[in-house]
Amino acid sequence: TREGWKCTLILTEGDSALTRAVAGLAVVGRDYYGCYPLRGKMLNVRDASSDQINKNQEIQAIKKIMGLQHKKRYEDVKSLRYGHLMNMADQDYDGSHIKGLLINFLETSFPGLLEIPGFLIEFITPIIKVSITKPRKQTLQFFNIPEYSKWRDEESSRYTWSYKYYKGLGTSGEQEMREYFSNLDLHLKTFHSLQQDEDEVIELAFSKKKADARKEWLRQYEPGTHLDHSLSEIPIKEFINKELILFSLADNIRSIPNVMDGLKPVQRKVIYGSFKHNVFKDTKVSTLAQYISAATEYHHGDAALQQTVVGLAQDFVGTNNIYLLIPKGAFGSRATGGKDAAASRYIYTHLNKLSSEIFNTKDQP
C-alpha cells in the first residue's frame, strides 16, 4: 500500500520464535507488522560470491518481502513495503551473531538503509530471570550474561533466589510475550544511523581478510564489558564492540580445545556428567546425554550433545588417541570419518577405566 513504509517487518529466529512474536502482536495489533522466520543464520555476504547470494533463500526472501531493488542506494523508505526492519533473535550469543550478520548484509548490499534513522531496530528479551523469595518477593531481568554474572558475584548473597535461563524466545510463554510488547520502551531498541567510521568496524568483524586484526580486537576485550541495554538508541559501533564480540569470544572457547586438558567445554561436560553419574556400566547414548544435560546446565540441542558423546567413544584409526568412553555398538568408521554411526538410541557406552587415571579423583564431582 501507499503507507507500507510505516510498517515493520519482524525477523524471528525460527518458527517457534515466530509464534511468540505473533502472541506479542495481540497487544500492539497486526495492521503495521509482518513476520518472517529465518532458518538458521544468515549468509555472511561480505566475502560471498554473487552466485552464493543469489541462491540464498533467506536473503532473497528479505529482499522480496521488503521490496528492495538490487544495488539501489536508498535515501528514504517511501518506496519500500516495510519502512522498518526489526530483528527478534534470541538473546544468547548466537542471537547476537544473527543481529550482526543482518547489519553486515545491509551495510554490504544496501548501506543507505543503515543511514536512515529508525530503519533498523531490535526487540530484546531477558536471557535470565532471577526470582527472589527473601527478604521480599521480586523478579530481576538480565539481558546479557556479564550483567547477570556481576549481580551473582556481588549482590546475590543477600537474597534467597533461583533463576531461569531463557535459551530462546520459545522459552517465553504467551503471557510473558504480551508483557514484553506492553513495555516497548524497555524491549524495543533502535540502532543509531550508520556513522562515518562504523563501516570499518563491521568489516573488522566479518571480513576474512581482517583475521589478524580480529585477533587483536578480541585480545583487547576487557572481561565484564557489555552493552548498556538501558540505551534507547544503540550505536552500531557499540553493538559490535560490546555485544557481538561476546559471540566471537564464546565461539572460540567452544570451538578450540583447551591447552590444559585438550577438551572443548561440551566434551568436558560429558566427562564431568559421566563421572557424576558413575557411568561405568553400559548406558544408552541418548540416556547419557539426558544425564549430562541436567547435571551441567547444557543449553544447546540434544543432537549436538549426543554427537559429542559418540565422538568421545570413537576408536577407529585417525580419531581419539585415547577414547575416554568405551563404544558398544556402531560408533562410525574411518571411511566416513565417523558420520556413519548408528542413532544414539541404538548404541551404548560407558567410561573407560583409563579415564579415572587421567582425571584426578580430587577433580571429579
Residue map of PLM features:
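Conserved phosphate-chemistry cores used by DNA topoisomerases
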Residues: 1-365
